[in-house]
Regions:
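Sec-dependent signal peptide recognition
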Residues: 2-8
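N-terminal, intrinsically disordered, polar/charged segments of Gram-positive cell-envelope systems
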Residues: 19-62
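Structural recognition of the beta-strand scaffold that forms the well-ordered cores
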Residues: 62-66, 104-108, 127-133, 143-145, ...
Length: 229
């Protein structure tokens, strides 16, 4: 009888221990699963944050359009001046650029003389200063002037964008350190485009009949520059 009692005591003790062990194991397993889940969530968050931190926002381009103020340079066959046509083109280009949130754009739309417009440019921390002109003197075609080597980039893009739209000669980009606004502007990049020769009737006709096209070429100049940043 004594042996039977001892056996029963051992049997119940064993069962009790087994229940505790099973409960403990279940708790530990559950804890491990929760820990793993939390760890996965943290990894996911880190991954998302890492992805966000690698996205780069390009800075907006600060642009100043400075159309010709030469009111006495008259177009062959027309009662219209270089200043008239270039202000029309500049305003159209301004409207295109203004609608595009990649750009902050300014314009001399009140015929400010060169000294005043250059002073304004120098107060605005401008990235790209583009002067808009047409040419005279018996030549033909398009050309762009730049100051020193730092602005050949703007000159190159301006000429390439415009040359897509006409079949007149291309006269290339040229360094010129004597133009007042190029010499005195503190913009990071500065250039002066001579679209075509207004003393050639066929080129004067082209300019007057294609204001929107000239404005589009200016707009595309800065799109291309922005995309290359």
């Amino acid at each position: 009888m004594k042996k039977q009692i001892i056996f029963l005591l051992l049997f119940f003790t064993s069962c009790s221990n087994n229940n505790i062990s099973s409960s403990t194991i279940t708790s530990i397993t559950s804890s491990n699963e929760n820990t793993s889940s939390i760890s996965n969530e943290i990894t996911s968050i880190k991954s998302e944050n890492s992805s966000q931190s690698t996205s780069i926002t390009k800075p907006k381009l600060r642009i100043y359009l400075n159309p010709s103020v030469q009111t006495k340079n008259m177009y062959t066959g027309y009662k219209i001046s270089e200043s008239d046509t270039m202000n029309i083109v500049a305003k159209k280009a301004y409207d295109l650029l203004k609608k595009d949130n990649r750009f902050i754009v300014y314009i001399n739309d009140s015929l400010k003389p060169l000294k005043e417009s250059v002073n304004e440019i120098n107060s605005l921390d401008i990235d790209y200063h583009l002067a808009l002109h047409t040419n005279a003197g018996g030549g033909s075609g398009s050309e762009v002037y730049y100051y020193e080597n730092t602005s050949s980039y703007l000159a190159k893009h301006s000429l390439e964008s415009f040359n897509k739209y006409h079949t007149f000669p291309t006269r290339g980009i040229k360094k010129n350190n004597n133009f007042y606004e190029l010499k005195n502007s503190k913009a990071k990049n500065k250039a002066l485009i001579e679209f075509l020769f207004h003393d050639k009737i066929n080129e004067a006709n082209f300019i007057i009949n294609n204001y929107d096209l000239l404005a589009t070429s200016v707009y595309e100049t800065f799109i291309n520059i922005f995309n290359e940043q």
